[in-house]
Amino acid sequence: EIGNIPGAVTAGERDGRIAEGLQHGNSPFEYSPTFIENKGLVLTTTNGTRLLYMALEKGAQNIITASFPNLSAVAAYLIAQNQNVLLACAAWKDRVNIEDTLFAGAVIDRVKEHFSINCDSSVMAHALYTAARPDLYEFVKNKKASHYLRLSAYGLEKDIQYCLTPDIANVLPVYKEGKLVTGTA
């Protein structure tokens, strides 16, 4: 049972709520450096976990996890790798969502001078990000983005703001030997 792994913090959510049998949810405010330091974290999410397994099934060679808080670390890593990149968005239950598309656009904005962009979805993501860049939170709020509506209904506006804030976590989770570990650019 994942909820009983000795010495590990077990966490996860299903549909925006702490998953049954786990200790914690996926709010960034549950994981202060002093709380999580030197501990393993076992995390499952409604959409991200599924995307990770999908990437593995498709034979992805190099998997990282990314979000606005680690945007610069992600961009630096992608530029340093100098390989073709596929940005795979976790979405929400097989449906496109605004915040994932905004993040893909932000990555494209940071790496576009180093890569050729040859996909309309990338062009659209970058255009959306360019429009939203002045205030990402207000953009998703004003557009009544589905994730915004769902999470704000739970009182998680602070989490949304945190997750849309670029470069506040200089960490790069890299998938190696069956788990995500801290990587470097």
Report each predicted region and the residues it spans.
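Glycine-rich phosphate/diphosphate-binding loops that line cofactor/substrate pockets in enzymes
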Residues: 77-85
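Short, structured patches in soluble enzyme cores that scaffold and shape functional sites
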Residues: 43-47, 65-68, 87-91
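Internal active-site segments that recognize and position negatively charged phosphoryl groups
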Residues: 50-55, 72-78
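Short, acidic/turn-prone active-site loops that include or flank metal/cofactor-
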Residues: 13-18, 48, 67-71
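Long, charged alpha-helical interface segments
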Residues: 23-46, 50, 54-62, 98-185
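Phosphate/ribose-phosphate-bearing ligand recognition and processing surfaces
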Residues: 90-100
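Class I S-adenosyl-L-methionine
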Residues: 1-35
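Short hydrophobic beta-strand segments
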Residues: 10, 84-89
